[in-house]
């Protein structure tokens, strides 16, 4: 995964196989520095003071605090079952962490590094993005919650109000949507883009090479109306 820091002047890349966070040159051509961790890096964010916060994989996941310039580790704490994403929010002045196998969103005070709030969200939250002037978080959950006998069967996205600390709404992706990987929001906070699969579970199991069973998809969410807009099939 790629992450920007220092107002877009610094580029970081996660190397999951090597359990590393790598700082690249601004043009992305050279490796300037790398930090090694005990488990694969899932995500990072930067707070208002320039510190970097990194969450790493594992049943007993870890959150690291790094000096923004030297990239030296300042502290580390245990942080739930597989913290999958982390985001600093300037309105709440806190860190928000999706806890994949806790099915929760945690708010953490960066000064004390203690959990302030736990919010129940969908099944296996894996990614998030801020919108509406940083007042809301869009949480992308990995799997559908409903039983396999239900209709439709699809992943739902959670919208969390940062100040009230409550789920303010949900958006369901098209029938068959599963295995969500990431979510991103445009600079105007008008649309969100979600990458996932659409499972063709109502079709016979043939022509697998044509994506008949699992098709890579990009779904677009209208953040003003707070509803699903359309989906683009990426496989041919």
Residue ranges and their predicted role:
Residues 17, 58, 101, 143, ...:
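Residue-level signature of beta-propeller blades and closely related beta-rich strand-turn architectures
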Residues 25-29, 67-71, 109-113, 161-165, ...:
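Short loop/turn segments that connect beta-strands within beta-propeller blades
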Residues 10-12, 51-54, 94-96, 137-138, ...:
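Conserved beta-propeller blade signature
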Residues 167-176, 226-236:
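Surface-exposed loop and turn segments in beta-propeller and other repeat-based domains
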Residues 1-20, 42-43:
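Beta-strand-rich domains and repeat architectures in extracellular enzymes and scaffolds
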Residues 140-154, 194-215:
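Short, conserved, GDST-rich strand-edge loop motifs in beta-rich repeat architectures
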Residues 5-8, 46-49, 89-92, 131-134, ...:
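Residue-level detector of Asp-centered blade-edge/turn motifs that repeat once per structural unit
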């Amino acid at each position: 995964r790629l992450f920007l820091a220092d107002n877009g002047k610094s580029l970081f890349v996660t190397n999951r196989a090597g359990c590393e966070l790598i700082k690249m040159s601004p043009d992305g051509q050279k490796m300037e520095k790398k930090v090694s961790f005990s488990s694969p890096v899932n995500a990072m964010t930067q707070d208002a003071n320039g510190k970097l916060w990194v969450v790493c994989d594992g049943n007993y996941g870890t959150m690291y605090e790094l000096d923004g310039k030297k990239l030296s580790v300042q502290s580390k704490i245990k942080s739930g079952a597989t913290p999958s994403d982390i985001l600093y929010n300037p309105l709440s002045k806190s860190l928000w962490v999706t806890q994949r196998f806790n099915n929760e969103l945690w708010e953490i005070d960066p000064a004390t590094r203690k959990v302030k709030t736990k919010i129940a969200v969908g099944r296996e939250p894996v990614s998030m993005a801020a919108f509406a002037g940083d007042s809301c978080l869009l949480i992308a959950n990995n799997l559908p919650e409903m039983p396999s006998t239900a209709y439709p069967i699809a992943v739902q996205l959670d919208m969390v109000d940062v100040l009230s600390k409550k789920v303010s709404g949900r958006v369901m992706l098209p029938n068959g949507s599963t295995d969500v990987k990431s979510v991103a929001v445009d600079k105007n906070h008008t649309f969100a883009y979600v990458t996932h699969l659409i499972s063709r579970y109502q079709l016979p199991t043939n022509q697998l090479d044509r994506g008949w069973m699992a098709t890579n998809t990009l779904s677009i969410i209208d953040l003003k109306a707070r509803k699903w807009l359309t989906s683009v099939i990426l496989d041919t």
